[in-house]
């Protein structure tokens, strides 16, 4: 064995002795180094020991006689854990000594201080005992953890008859890395709250609690399912309340595809055919019911007369012609009625003056040639006295309004007897709807001696009057729908062009236009009609339109080549100049398609195009 003096520690082995002259060598304890090696090698050689023990078990015989009679003692446990356990026990002993010393000090304090409350004493003792108990528990848990980790690292026993005299360590209170615990609560806090609420609801006994039993009978489902089916199409009368109803009624409703069979596709009718059908229809259709309705409306004549005598004007509206009704009321009933009433009043006053019937002036508003100056001249001849007509005004401007103002000032001081009945047919007519005409009539209605009886056909006729005109008229509205035909009113308009624009001319008007054009223009128009009819024939009967549209037109460049081939137009400029006449009379249209190419097409039906080819363009 070598002594400890023979081992010397060097700071630098490779250094020279000169460098280490001033350095004193350090002594190393070989026994302490051996202990450290022993601690580190215990874990390192663990697998080697386990393999050796397994080999020894295989080599040993299973004969029980060879086994030792006396039980072998457990080998000494090597390693660091014993030292750790000893240190922990020493700490526990120190803590117990400290607690005993603290208790002795408190007893001395109690003897010295006699004024301390009993409640504070007991509370302090409890706190101290709790602290010491917590410390003891923590130290015990540390000891148990240390022992379990140590036993896990120890090699297994090879001898079958080995019996350990040491008591088994208790299970650790806190789970370690090696220990497995199965008692885990995986319920989330939210689930725990829900379960607690359900438990409280289950335990609560309320008088209105719903209890279901086997005898529970559900509500029967109605058999008539049509009562509860919601209609796909909403009716016009059903809408929401409040402001939502406003938007619900005015929302855009997507309707089904429009029908191709519109009134524009209807065949054209000649004037002779129209007059024949309309005359027969107007005379015979619902003739007796219309007469009965007229007799019922006549019973309101006294009411109308009373309203006129009280200073009101009458305005009649409704479906049908009101011309015969107004003339019969004004001429046959109102004029003699007012005359006889005035005669009776004068007889009471014993005034022997001849009384003639009240004059009636009828204005035909449906006549476009009606002029307000001519109307005012007729009124002044009937109402204005001679002294007013002699003094002419020298003012520039509208003399009609100045003359009416003189009449208003004159008749303010006259008796309120009606001296003129002014009947206006179609107050919303094309000539009377002008502002000057409406202003003149509104000023005339201010005069109480003039009774105005008028009629309107358009539903928006009151929009012609502003606030001042409406106050001057002072109308009372009456509905007299009599469904009479407007035979006289329609004579001042072209019935065949009703519903069409003023500039457009039909196939009948195209005949007169073609007669006044040159032969070259007629050939060009005939070629256009023939190419369009060919395009209309190529389309199927279901999808093809019955009237010429952009879809059935001809490209301008292609049509230019066709005209050049037939020696009609040599270039595009000449072709455009020839087409200008047809475009102005709405006999042809030029538009651009989606690709930007110009298309020429004739806006007539297939039958009209055939008719033009057979009549006017047949000789070409």
From Swiss-Prot:
Q: What does this protein do?
A: Component of the origin recognition complex (ORC) that binds origins of replication. It has a role in both chromosomal replication and mating type transcriptional silencing. Binds to the ARS consensus sequence (ACS) of origins of replication.
Q: What is the lineage of its organism?
A: Eukaryota, Fungi, Dikarya, Ascomycota, Saccharomycotina
User: What is the protein name stated in its UniProt record?
Assistant: Origin recognition complex subunit 2
Q: Which gene encodes it?
A: ORC2
User: Which BP terms in the Gene Ontology apply to this protein?
Assistant: DNA replication initiation; pre-replicative complex assembly involved in nuclear cell cycle DNA replication; silent mating-type cassette heterochromatin formation; subtelomeric heterochromatin formation
Task: Spell out the family assignment given in the record's similarity comment.
Answer: Belongs to the ORC2 family.
Compositionally biased spans, kind Basic and acidic residues? 26-36, 83-101, 128-143
Annotated stretches, region: Disordered: 1-184, 204-225
* Keyword terms of this UniProt record: DNA replication, Nucleus, Phosphoprotein
Please verify whether the record's keywords include Magnesium: no
Organism (species): Saccharomyces cerevisiae (strain ATCC 204508 / S288c) (Baker's yeast)
Q: What else is known?
A: Present with 1700 molecules/cell in log phase SD medium.
């Amino acid at each position: 064995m070598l002594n400890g003096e023979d081992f010397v520690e060097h700071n630098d082995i490779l250094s020279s002795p000169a460098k280490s002259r001033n350095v004193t060598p350090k002594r190393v304890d070989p026994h302490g180094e051996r202990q450290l090696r022993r601690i580190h090698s215990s874990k390192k050689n663990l697998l080697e020991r386990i393999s050796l023990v397994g080999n020894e078990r295989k080599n040993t015989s299973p004969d029980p006689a060879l086994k030792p009679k006396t039980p072998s003692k457990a080998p000494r446990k090597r390693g660091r854990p014993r030292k750790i356990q000893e240190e922990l026990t020493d700490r526990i002993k120190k803590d117990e000594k400290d607690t005993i010393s603290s208790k002795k000090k408190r007893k001395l304090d109690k003897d010295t201080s006699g004024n301390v409350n009993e409640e504070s004493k007991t509370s302090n003792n409890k706190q101290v005992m709790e602290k010491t108990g917590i410390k003891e528990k923590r130290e015990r848990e540390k000891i148990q953890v240390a022992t379990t980790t140590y036993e896990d690292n120890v090699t297994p026993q090879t001898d079958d008859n080995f019996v350990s005299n040491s008591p088994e360590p208790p299970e650790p209170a806190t789970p370690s890395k090696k220990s497995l615990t199965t008692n885990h609560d995986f319920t989330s806090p939210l689930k725990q709250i829900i379960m607690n609420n359900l438990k409280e609801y289950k335990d609560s006994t309320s008088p209105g609690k719903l209890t279901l039993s086997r005898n529970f009978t559900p509500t029967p489902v109605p058999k008539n399912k049509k009562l509860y089916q919601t209609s796909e199409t909403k009716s016009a009368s059903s809408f929401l309340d409040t402001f939502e109803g406003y938007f619900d009624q005015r929302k855009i409703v997507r309707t089904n595809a429009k029908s191709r069979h519109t009134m524009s596709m209807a065949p054209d009718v000649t004037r002779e055919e129209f007059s024949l059908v309309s005359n027969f229809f107007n005379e015979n259709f619902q003739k007796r019911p219309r007469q009965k309705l007229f007799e019922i409306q006549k019973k309101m004549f006294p009411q109308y007369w009373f309203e006129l005598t009280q200073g009101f004007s009458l305005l009649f509206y409704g479906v049908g012609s009101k011309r015969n009704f107004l003339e019969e009321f004004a001429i046959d009933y109102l004029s003699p009625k007012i005359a006889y009433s005035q005669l009776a009043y004068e007889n009471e006053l014993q005034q022997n003056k001849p009384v003639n019937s009240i004059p009636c002036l009828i204005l035909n508003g449906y006549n476009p040639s009606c002029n307000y100056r001519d109307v005012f001249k007729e009124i002044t001849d009937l109402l204005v006295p001679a002294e007013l007509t002699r003094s002419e005004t020298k003012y520039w401007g509208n003399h009609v309004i100045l003359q009416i103002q003189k009449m208003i000032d004159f008749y303010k001081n006259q008796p309120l007897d009606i001296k003129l009945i002014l009947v206006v047919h179609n107050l919303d007519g094309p000539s009377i709807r002008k502002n000057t005409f409406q202003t003149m009539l509104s000023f005339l209605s201010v005069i109480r001696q003039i009774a105005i009886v008028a009629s309107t056909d358009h539903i928006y006729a009151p929009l012609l009057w502003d606030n001042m005109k409406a106050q001057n008229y002072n109308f009372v509205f009456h509905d007299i729908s009599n469904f009479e035909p407007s035979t006289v009113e329609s004579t001042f308009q072209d019935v065949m062009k009703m519903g069409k624009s003023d500039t457009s001319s039909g196939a009948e008007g195209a005949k007169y236009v073609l007669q006044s054009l040159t032969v070259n223009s007629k050939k060009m128009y005939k070629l256009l009609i023939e190419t369009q009819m060919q395009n209309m024939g190529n389309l199927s009967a279901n999808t093809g339109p019955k009237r010429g549209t952009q879809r059935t037109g001809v490209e301008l460049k292609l049509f230019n080549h066709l005209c050049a081939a037939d020696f009609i137009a040599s270039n595009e400029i000449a072709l455009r100049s020839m087409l200008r006449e047809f475009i102005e009379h709405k006999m042809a249209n030029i538009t651009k398609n989606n690709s930007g190419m110009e298309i020429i097409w004739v806006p007539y039906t297939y039958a009209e195009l055939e008719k033009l080819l057979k009549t006017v363009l047949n000789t070409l």
